[in-house]
């Protein structure tokens, strides 16, 4: 019985860590449902090679005019690493959303290293997708993108 309560206490401590370490600029923050759908979209995009990982790649892609969906981790330290991303996304018309954990973001993006941000694109970096694969990815992308835009307007 004692180990059960200790396990429950450790889970509660982990939940508190997310709340404490979350950056103050992490708005709009995805809720649990949106977060789950976003991570599923990232997993599909990673499998199809339609994903840019890391701040440098994401910034480079946005500046070159590539459209997509930017997902930023909210527990980045130091925060200066990602403070320019929301402004860059707004200027380029790219929807963006924050998720609480960089570790979860990396896991969804099929990498072992924690990732600050990812950009989900509809076109792969190399090669082409079949029409069926593109249609599936596009429907998921549009659904998540619409939810993020709705969330962003409710925050502002």
Swiss-Prot record:
Gene3D superfamilies given in the database record: 3.30.1330.30
GO CC terms, sorted: nucleolus; sno(s)RNA-containing ribonucleoprotein complex
Main location: nucleus
Keyword Transcription regulation belongs to the record: no
Disulfide links within the chain: none
Keyword Methyltransferase: no
Compartment(s) of residence: Nucleus, Nucleolus
One GO term (biological process): rRNA pseudouridine synthesis
GO molecular function terms listed in the Swiss-Prot or TrEMBL record: mRNA binding
Keywords annotated in UniProt: Nucleus, Ribonucleoprotein, Ribosome biogenesis, RNA-binding, rRNA processing
Subunit structure and binding partners: Component of the small nucleolar ribonucleoprotein particle containing H/ACA-type snoRNAs (H/ACA snoRNPs).
Family: Belongs to the eukaryotic ribosomal protein eL8 family.
Its biological purpose: Required for ribosome biogenesis. Part of a complex which catalyzes pseudouridylation of rRNA. This involves the isomerization of uridine such that the ribose is subsequently attached to C5, instead of the normal N1. Pseudouridine ('psi') residues may serve to stabilize the conformation of rRNAs.
Name of the protein this chain belongs to: H/ACA ribonucleoprotein complex subunit 2-like protein
Source organism (scientific name): Arabidopsis thaliana (Mouse-ear cress)
